[in-house]
Amino acid sequence: MRNRCILPVLSFVMLCTAARGVAGSLTCDTKSISFTDGYAGWQLLAADGERDVTRQARYESGNSAVARVDVNGHVTPIADGSTLIRIQHDGDKLEIPVRVQGAGADRPVDFKRELVPLLSRMGCNAGGCHGKASGQNGFKLSLFGFDAAFDRDAIVNEARGRRVFPAAPDFSLLLLKATGQLPHGGGKRMRRDGNEYRLFRSWIASGMPSSAPDAPHVVKLRIAPADRVLARNGQQQLAVRAEYSDGSIRDVTRQAEYASNLDVVARVDADGLVHTLQMSGEAAIMARYLGYVAVFRAMVPHGERLKEIAEFRPANYIDDLTLAKWKKLGLRPSPLADDAVFLRRVTLDLCGRLPTAAEARAFLADTAADKRAKLIDRLLDSPDYPAYFAMRWGTILRNSNLAGSTNAAYAFHNWIKDSIARNRPYDEFVRGIVAAAGEWQESPAINWYWQSRDDQLHQVTADTAQVFLGVRLQCARCHHHPYERWGQADYYGLAGFFTRLGRKSFGEPPPYFASANVTTGEKDPLTGKTPEPKYLDGPSAKFTPEQDPRHALVDWMAKPDNPFFARALVNRLWGHFLGRGLYHEVDDLRETNPPSNPELLDALAQDFTKHKFDVKHIICTIVNSRVYQLSSEPTPHNKNDRQNYARYYARRLPAEVLLDAIDQTTGTRGNFSGVGSNARAVDLPHEGFGSYFLDTFDRPRRVTGCECERSTGATLAQVLLLGNSDEIESKIAAGDGRLARLMKEKKPLGDILEELYLTAYARRPSAEELKRTLAHLEGAANKQQALEDVLWAILNTKEFMFNH
């Protein structure tokens, strides 16, 4: 019973009117409040329909000697007894019964559960203050409070105990600095009349006790409301409640930390009040408390809610679920892209190349209603599809020659390409990598392990989580993840699946094998023992000496109810084809980074699992959707949309694709040593092929499994290279290039221009473009040079450099 008294037991019913309320539209999320100690608090949420009026309502306590309520609806206990909190707004009234017990009881303050969250909220244990590796001015705390015992020792025992003074708590250095009574680099962090000061003072006065080992602990954090559609320049008060292992609930609205993932849409203050700004869109507001997180989603519509969008005709469930979101947000989509734009887009996305002029002519002339679907099937059946996606997978799987074995890098590249060409089920593809063993000639995927040989256990653990599960687990190696639920136990639990992996002492790469006799020397810092396998967010696993735990790990990944595996892959594919993942970034699936359309993500993941991890099926579903086929031209209704796919998001071509596009348009080939003369840049098996162009346009170095290593941003060096480099000039003027061939064939200037436009843009020049360009050419003394200028101009247009 003593531990139960540490926490206030409070009951609440979401959005229910109090029993003694006067009839009207005013509601409160709380039916009654029951406090069991004097350190508690409770945030009321008042609403008028769906509109938050917490900060507009008036509050009054029937007996302020028992409980007080401030102007923002926050209730605090004062003394034992019962009273009513009256809420008034626009003539409506509510009364919330409040009962207080134990307000005067001198119960101990729990350091971990009550003070560590305050240190986090005040920023004391952040990386820029006492939480950094070296501490600050001789005082170091654990980063984000992940080690409460360490923090207590630092406060109580370090520096000969000078930070606390139990005999006269108010003169403790900890409180004097935090209240600004003594100089403090971090400034004033608390008020002497505040609840934070009361808690710290009481703890010091009682002798700075350690946290009771059997005290209730947080099991879940909830935020109310979970989401809201808010107007521009609107506001919403949040309430955060922690559920404890003994069944009790504590309001921690004023102890939690808050952050917005999109400040241009919505901001949040220290007390959980969300303010929306002028920008429409969606923002996720994170609340963090004792390592747990909860998220509120603020949706700011682009316009009034729409009943119908008659001009958009769904083709599959992707369109249905996206359409529902547009209606909710008042978004009208752009029209469908025309045939030329679609042909170029889907060929680039599926094959990493431009359509040929012949392909463009045939597609534009085709009048069949299903020609787009047939085109998609042809492209997926072509050898260019596995070649392009082998490059993309080789990048995030870090297939590199940096490890010293070019032959193994070639073999791994070919293994990936063959798996894609055969449409190998994704779970089998992952098993071939994660559970790879043997010699590289028979098992090329061991090169994935060989790339990590200097820090194998940790690199493989981090890559497995990020690449195949979409979880960035690296932070949890050293401390609890600041924006997720993952801690060191989760990290080392996943690492435990790889502790039996060993390698021979010969060969590059050497043969790999799994054995219970392998000793990594790595210890779990929490236990001091070899990491034991534990499924992420799941149970521990036990294996016999003969078993390879990695196979069990893949079995767990492929289970239909796995919350990460299928979602990670469909989100990665969605990001590739639509320019932005439903989770953004595509390999960062976490609660505090929620998907822009969770219903769509779930539907894609379920479809993927239902079809036995058929990657081609999901790709077909995505690119056959009307959402994928929308124009990139914004309309007045969607010009500010960045999250909901009301138009196609244009993006610069990746380095390898752009170089190949230039070669294709100019009729030249890249000159890469060690590969065939017909090899494209996307065919290169690793990053070791020298190319100033590829490096300038941010070809990944393949040193990380993160998609973020590839950049499609613009730099001055890129502009200068395209506009004024010998490399581009030589391709345009090549004697065996496209222009030279067309001139030798004595093609009419109009035909030459059509060929260039069809090759570069998959469309014919408009009448105005043709008129202006022909006028330029016909007035030029040197037709060859004038055509070279035209081609150079084409290569420098956004229409060429971007997939749109």
Task: Locate predicted features.
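Short, intrinsically disordered, charge-biased short linear motifs at domain edges
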Residues: 108-119, 459-466
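Solvent-exposed helix-loop boundary motif
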Residues: 35-39, 47, 65-78, 83-90, ...
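Proline/serine/threonine-rich low-complexity linkers at boundaries of modular beta-sandwich domains
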Residues: 20-25, 209-220
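Short, structured secondary-structure elements
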Residues: 128, 141, 145, 151-156, ...
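Positively charged n-region of N-terminal signal peptides that target proteins for export
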Residues: 1-5
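Catalytic cores of secreted or luminal carbohydrate-active enzymes
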Residues: 190-210, 717-724, 728-733
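Bacterial N-terminal signal peptides
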Residues: 8-17
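N-terminal edge beta-strand
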Residues: 24-32
